[in-house]
């Protein structure tokens, strides 16, 4: 079974997603709660969601918050020989991770699959064939960044007018405005 992939990201107006291994903007508590809720909430009783992230993203998470709780965590790395402490699984590539998820012992436990970063993992996911959703928080300001989100090909991805559980009005925290968007492609 090929399940839909979901990418979730917060991105500044200049497409920045990271700076020095952290977010380019000050912590936005409600935006973080949205990330937690979306990636944790399973619609199937007895199943858990699964998050896939690159090695740098894993190590950018404060140690006390690793692994992301109530989710199965897969870390991608070509260099590491075993999963970093706290991670549930290690895979060499996104394709390897997706194959791993379809193994019987995992397939029966996993509900939604979420890609949580970084840039190259998002890029690889967005180029996958099939059903993909992008959950994008648009931070409506520019922030100095050293890591960026790939361009969304609007020929492939359609911005949905609304999505269950996603607020459509502009949010504001700490003087920073942002809005939630959901894009989808099916091919």
Curated annotation (Swiss-Prot):
InterPro entries assigned to the protein according to its UniProt record, in alphabetical order = DHFR, DHFR-like_dom_sf, DHFR_CS, DHFR_dom
Q: Say yes or no: keyword Mitochondrion present.
A: yes
Keyword Acetylation in record: yes
Task: Tell me the first and last residues of the signal peptide.
Answer: none
CDD domains on file: DHFR
**Subunit-level organization:** Homodimer.
One Pfam family cited in the UniProt record for this chain: DHFR_1
The kind of enzyme this is, by top-level EC class, is oxidoreductase
Q: What is its EC number?
A: 1.5.1.3
Q: What does this protein do?
A: Key enzyme in folate metabolism. Contributes to the de novo mitochondrial thymidylate biosynthesis pathway. Catalyzes an essential reaction for de novo glycine and purine synthesis, and for DNA precursor synthesis. Binds its own mRNA.
- Pathway as given in its UniProt record: Cofactor biosynthesis; tetrahydrofolate biosynthesis; 5,6,7,8-tetrahydrofolate from 7,8-dihydrofolate: step 1/1
PANTHER family linked to this entry: DIHYDROFOLATE REDUCTASE
Which positions carry N6-acetyllysine?
Answer: 33
What organism does this protein naturally occur in?
Mus musculus (Mouse)
The record's similarity note reads: Belongs to the dihydrofolate reductase family.
Q: What are the binding positions for substrate in this chain?
A: 31-36, 65, 71
Q: What is its main location?
A: mitochondrion
Which Gene Ontology BP annotations are present? regulation of removal of superoxide radicals; response to methotrexate; tetrahydrobiopterin biosynthetic process; tetrahydrofolate biosynthetic process; tetrahydrofolate interconversion; tetrahydrofolate metabolic process
Q: What is this protein called?
A: Dihydrofolate reductase
Name the UniProt key words of this record, in alphabetical order: Acetylation, Cytoplasm, Methotrexate resistance, Mitochondrion, NADP, One-carbon metabolism, Oxidoreductase, RNA-binding
């Amino acid at each position: 079974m090929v399940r839909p992939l979901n990418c979730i990201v917060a991105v500044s107006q200049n497409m920045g997603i990271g700076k020095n291994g952290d977010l380019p903007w000050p912590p936005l508590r409600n935006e973080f709660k949205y990330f937690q809720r979306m990636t944790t909430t399973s619609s199937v009783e007895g199943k858990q969601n699964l998050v896939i992230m690159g090695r740098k993203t894993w190590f950018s998470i404060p140690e006390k918050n690793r692994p992301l709780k109530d989710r199965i965590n897969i870390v991608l790395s070509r260099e590491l020989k075993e999963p970093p402490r706290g991670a549930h699984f290690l895979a060499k590539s996104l394709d390897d991770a997706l194959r791993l998820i379809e193994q019987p012992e995992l397939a029966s436990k996993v509900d939604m699959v979420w890609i949580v970063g970084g840039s190259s993992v998002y890029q690889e996911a967005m180029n996958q064939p099939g059903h993909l959703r992008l959950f994008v928080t648009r931070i409506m300001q520019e922030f100095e960044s050293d890591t960026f989100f790939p361009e969304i090909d609007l020929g492939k991805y359609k911005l949905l007018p609304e999505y269950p559980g996603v607020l459509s009005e502009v949010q504001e925290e700490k003087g920073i405005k942002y809005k939630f968007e959901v894009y989808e492609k099916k091919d």
